[in-house]
Curated annotation (Swiss-Prot):
Start-end of Polar residues biased regions: 522-532, 672-696, 1074-1088
Any one GO BP annotation for this protein: cortical microtubule organization
Region (Disordered): 238-264, 503-539, 611-660, 672-715, 1074-1101
Basic and acidic residues: compositionally biased ranges: 699-715
Post-translational modification N-acetylmethionine, affected residues: 1
Protein localization: Cytoplasm, Cytoskeleton; Cytoplasm, Cytoskeleton, Spindle; Cytoplasm, Cytoskeleton, Phragmoplast; Cytoplasm, Cell cortex
Organism in which the protein naturally occurs: Arabidopsis thaliana (Mouse-ear cress)
Protein name from the UniProt record: CLIP-associated protein
Cellular compartments per GO CC: cell cortex; cytoplasmic microtubule; mitochondrion; phragmoplast; plasmodesma; spindle microtubule
Amino acid sequence: MEEALEMARAKDTKERMAAVERLHQLLEASRKSLSPAEVTSLVDSCLDLLKDSNFRVSQGALQALASAAVLAGEHLKLHLNALVPAVVERLGDSKQPVRDAARRLLTTLMEVSSPTIIVERAGSYAWMHKSWRVREEFARTVTSAIGLFASTELPLQRVILAPILQMLNDPNQAVREAAILCIEEMYMQGGSQFREELQRHHLPSYMVKDINARLERIEPQLRSTDGRSAHHVVNEVKASSVNPKKSSPRAKAPTRENSLFGGDADITEKPIEPIKVYSEKELIREFEKIAATLVPEKDWSMRISAMRRVEGLVAGGATDYSCFRGLLKQLVGPLSTQLADRRSTIVKQACHLLCLLSKELLGDFEACAETFIPVLFKLVVITVLVIAESADNCIKTMLRNCKAARVLPRIAESAKHDRNAILRARCCEYALLTLEHWPDAPEIQRSVDLYEDLIRCCVADAMSEVRATARMCYRMFAKTWPDRSRRLFSSFDPVIQRLINEEDGGIHRRHASPSVRERHSQPSFSQTSAPSNLPGYGTSAIVAMDRSSNLSSGGSLSSGLLLSQSKDVNKGSERSLESVLQSSKQKVSAIESMLRGLHISDRQNPAALRSSSLDLGVDPPSSRDPPFHAVAPASNSHTSSAAAESTHSINKGSNRNGGLGLSDIITQIQASKDSGRSSYRGNLLSESHPTFSSLTAKRGSERNERSSLEESNDAREVRRFMAGHFDRQQMDTAYRDLTFRESNASHVPNFQRPLLRKNVGGRMSAGRRRSFDDSQLQIGDISNFVDGPASLNEALNDGLNSSSDWCARVAAFNFLQTLLQQGPKGAQEVIQSFEKVMKLFLRHLDDPHHKVAQAALSTLADLIPSCRKPFESYMERVLPHVFSRLIDPKEVVRQPCSSTLEIVSKTYSVDSLLPALLRSLDEQRSPKAKLAVIEFAINSFNRYAGNPEISGNSGILKLWLAKLTPLTRDKNTKLKEASITCIISVYNHYDSAGLLNYILSLSVEEQNSLRRALKQYTPRIEVDLLNYMQSKKEKQRIKSYDPSDAIGTSSEEGYAGASKKNIFLGRYSGGSIDSDSGRKWSSSQEPTMITGGVGQNVSSGTQEKLYQNVRTGISSASDLLNPKDSDYTFASAGQNSISRTSPNGSSENIEILDDLSPPHLEKNGLNLTSVDSLEGRHENEVSRELDLGHYMLTSIKVNTTPESGPSIPQILHMINGSDGSPSSSKKSGLQQLIEASVANEESVWTKYFNQILTVVLEVLDDEDFSIKELALSLISEMLKSQKDAMEDSVEIVIEKLLHVSKDTVPKVSTEAEQCLTTVLSQYDPFRCLSVIVPLLVTEDEKTLVACINCLTKLVGRLSQEELMDQLSSFLPAVFEAFGSQSADVRKTVVFCLVDIYIMLGKAFLPYLEGLNSTQVRLVTIYANRISQARNGAPIDADT
């Protein structure tokens, strides 16, 4: 590339043309990322070439930049300010190829950066450009951008709309036409919402008329919805009934939803048009074309179209061809190439396609998944968030839908030993996901050793997220292999054992799965206590018969379904319901006795079931054949009452036998819900519980016309029926008979519901079902509703069972909701099992099936008002899951989510919500989700009814503000605006003083940045902040300042300032000295005893109480006195008095102590007095000043001895600068303290050490580097002269010095490093380690390098035994730092490990197993060299 850039500088035009062509070829062929230096060199050269007189050179430079943008990544963003204007100028070039290349480059920049940002930057030059051609081409560019990015970049249209509307008035016709085309594209993407947006701009009527005329001619591309129109589906069903041959793949219509992620992804895709193929040859040709397109040489938009074409083929029914799976293997290579592409759009589309294929093919996709997952590992760790999230979601979706057991060793190896912490964390999640979804698979059962090694290694990982996931994996391991888990647990470190035991009682962010199976329980089943997960048993009549027999030998009955009579085809014999029941009574007892003998684990064993059911003449469902067939749902237009009527006949029998009928549940829901919500619930129920009572018999002749082909293809036909409404009166009888026979075969033997669900959920072949397809409801699922749980405990067990299907989970939530609607009695039952109830919510709020999530959120909305108090303790763990569903692609999930949050907002105050909001904001990765959390917080703060002047929950509030502050600088405009609005809302409604104190506690840079951001929205906070700072200074001036009783507060409230709630006298009580460290410490200095000379009129009790109150910092003067001591006088030298003060604090007469002052009276802005006539030395006296009707206690400084210079308190006051003292005063004060440190008078340093250290550490944040340099000189001197006193505060000194060592001024940073060296070499090494070790996990490179350097120095001071004891505390973090991308960090780690190696010798080698071979070799080589240089012999020779 360097040669090509050199050629591009040639004078000859042909050479330049050849150079740009060569450059373009090199960049297109390259797969290696460009370095920052290469990007800079390339951009600089191309910017010159863009202005070249030859248009082909300009065109080539633009093409080269477009190729480089994909390889440059983040490095290109530094050059956008120079690059974008130059590209905009090329939009006005006289040659069309140059203009096209410029448009393509802008589109590419939008792809690799942010479309909104690029449009804003380019628009500032292009919208009002003097060249009409630039304006026209830019309008066409943004039009194509809307088509590409509108679905993923929501703010884009708003940024474009206003300037595009202005272009409609452009004098040039071509520009106006380009603008109207852009408006048409926005309408196609936005639909009716775009019209509403247009109305806000108040356009002239003639313009509105013209726009509407253009828009009426186009049809907006509507987003995918649940199902299709009723008319279309009815026609389809009728056509299918007339001609059974239509069930071929050619005629198969796609009933699948277009949003195929099922709630897993955060994107909305354009609907895919089904592509039908009519032969295998045609399908083969399609695949060949697609494979030829998916090569790097093809344009990226063509490759995206090819992948979308595969989706269209799948939607058109291509998966039903037997050759599809073989053809798919041809795409493995091309799709892997697309995954390796640098464009996020291509990667995202490829991941989307893989998710779709895995959901379609299920187990048949397993071989492909095992190939793709290792490729996706490389993407999970990439810095581009869109790519990383798409890859992560893709892997998880594939693991949910197919076992991919052969890739499990690779997952485990990466989780244990990969250098990248993110990949280790993700691989731990993948291993846990596999164990959760496939615990019974033989391949997983054989992987027990692999899981054991994985958990043992990962629970000790350096990254907390890996450790937490490994502990969750252990809990799943314990439930899957209980015997092995005990041995594994005993091998853990005691700390890990304690963590696991503590966490077992709670639910975590990802939450552990429930028990897969109870291996040792032996329940006895009886007719009176049979659980409802045995369909039909104890709740409905049981009819056992052979599946193959016809009605003449045995009636067909599904569980819970009672028919008045059934006739066979030949009308030869008729058997009423009564005769059928009578004939089955003899078999009931046999079934009961058989069930009592079954072990619970046998219920999940198909072989055991088969053997037990053979005696009854029943053929149980195999794992290959679907046990149930889907039936069409009731019309969505029916209300819940209609559903109740239609299901009445279903539930009569079950109610008679003691079961809970569906009609009862519906009635209860109707009774407690309003009409609107009842209708909503009814629609849901009618979807979920298809009715049988409306199925009517047809003539026998029609039955005879049905062919066996329709029976064999029944499952496929039924899926098509499920898309919407259907004419139930025209339902054919052959279908009904087949349904009865199949349902009879399914329900009679399947008393064991876990097997039933297992067959439905994951053991069928891919050709017979679709995973997570909500439009395919099967009869087995219906029975799960009809035979719903009979008790809360049973509902919770069903919902928490990891092998349960989505219907069982919905049924569990429906039962819980019904219980809550029964009033206090039902709520009390829920509260008794509240922990288990919350486990159910935490498990399924993130469920990928939208109906489960919808049911969970709706039930949660009912639970919160009923269980307000117990839910509050779970709120912090639940709300993050709720907020994550607020951006779900499906409206049916978002709507109940919004309702739930509204109820939470009304039920709890912001004080209770703040911890949950803090955690929610911390856990959301998507900007949209973060925005939702902040907007919710704004509403909560605005509703706060308290007084904003009174401090709220200050600790949590500071953490919340600390989370918001970085977001005020976020590149996402909406997120930035919401963060600033939230901070303003805190100030206006919640805690104004807390916010002001927080701003003052920030560093100078952060403080200025935040204040600038707030000033743009409201000047009020800035004004109040200045007044607040000024009032604090004035208060400090009025107050006395006593050297022995200096008042100190945290740096947030200013030196020597009074706290809001109390005043501390004589005891330093410092808060956070440094906003980074947050460490609190206080001196042990006590106030000086008030001794004699206080007047005779003060009673001894009052005097004693006065002294006690001074010690404890009581601020109210009236508290100093008992009511009986309200009359008192302080007399001193016969002329000073304080007259009567009433107990409530009001004053009748106040006379300030006023003596004839001697010449040594010190004022300095304070009330000082010296009384020579008093007997004894008076260190303190009390003075009261009237301040706004309240008395404030102040200290009175008594100067008893003459001094030649200023006292220590004066110096501290001068350095602190609270009186506005200039820099020269601060320097003078620091110089005097240095001299005092050298003199080292014990009396001075004993009394004032803490106050001096406080001021010195605070002044290290001064903007003037010379002051910081002087302060560091003082610290250096104190470290030498006041060593004993400094030893007690060494932790906070080290933290502050580490912070200052990063200063940009070399003199300051060098001085700080010298101070650190002194501390580390002379002070207690273990106290130093206690500060350094926790900081080794920091992400800041400079801090990390400094900490590792400190660690290296400390290592040399420890003995071998001490060092061996400490290794476990810091080695994991050091090894983690070894994998850093920074060369400085890696180099520092090497020297640290080398020093340890030299000290410990071969004993250190076992600890190096955490490193890879290259790293170990590097450490040993350096260690031998350094040891040779120091000792004359390498380590290997010594040991």
